Amino acid sequence: MASYAVLGATGNTGQALINILLQSPEKKIHAYCRSKQKLLRLTPQLAGNKNVKVFEGSLNDTAVIADCIRGSRAVFLAVAVPDNMPGMTIAQDTARVTVNALQRIRAENEKAILPKVIVLSSAKLDDKLCQNMPNAMKVLVKLATSNQCADLKESQRILTAERHWISSTFMMPGGLVQDAQKGHALSLETEKTPLSYLDLAAGMVEVADAEDEYHMKNVSVIPTGTGVKFPYESLLEVVKGLLAHYFPWTYRYTGAMPMPVLPQKTA
């Protein structure tokens, strides 16, 4: 029975991954979160499920992360900040602790089979995947997610530097929305918006179960069903993202997360 580790089990993508994995009784789930209480509140069906093991702790705790991903077929890096928070480092922090955890596992047993690393990223980072997006829209979206993009780029750089011993795949969907699972396809050529979190998760699991054809590749997930809801709330997020890009201090009043302490500029 294969195990799958989900880092960021309480987030939108993490919750979708857990729901997709629960559809297959032969799959075991290792769910990492900072609050087990919150996870069980969001997904009460996990309580008492013998195929689910919850790992609770700080994202900086290499031992906890190593325990979570040890023996798994794949580890999904789905820890994320949902907006354009200035100074965010959550994606690169997750990449670093994953590398450290895999180093620990390899040090314990040099013959250990390491899991694939399936990384939640964004189509905004790949011009090829965004080739069908109007240029003006592309510029606007990149500005509105500038801090998020910088964090994701650094995360990808960290994992790419370890490609000789860690197999990573970078999942790059377009705009995401909460909706039912309606069908998906994997694409190396283009993104398509909107896409439901559940269809994204199904695509991520498909990559995890594939052979090595997606090693170190940027992979998008596109919807194949019809009637996917348009995320109208994303229009407001674009405005708030632009404010965070040009006037970082506004995030204190508009952001979804506590305002981080930003480094002081020197003269």
UniProtKB/Swiss-Prot annotation:
It holds the Pfam family NAD_binding_10. Keywords: Monooxygenase, Oxidoreductase. Pathway: Mycotoxin biosynthesis. It comes from the Eukaryota. InterPro entries: NAD(P)-bd_dom, NAD(P)-bd_dom_sf. Its EC number is 1.-.-.-. One of its GO terms (molecular function) is monooxygenase activity. The keyword Oxidoreductase applies. SUPFAM superfamilies: NAD(P)-binding Rossmann-fold domains. Induction: Expression is positively regulated by the dothistromin-specific transcription factors aflR and aflJ. Belongs to the avfA family. PANTHER family: FLAVIN REDUCTASE-RELATED, UPF0659 PROTEIN YMR090W. Oxidoreductase; part of the fragmented gene cluster that mediates the biosynthesis of dothistromin (DOTH), a polyketide toxin very similar in structure to the aflatoxin precursor, versicolorin B. The first step of the pathway is the conversion of acetate to norsolorinic acid (NOR) and requires the fatty acid synthase subunits hexA and hexB, as well as the polyketide synthase pksA. PksA combines a hexanoyl starter unit and 7 malonyl-CoA extender units to synthesize the precursor NOR. This is Oxidoreductase ordB.
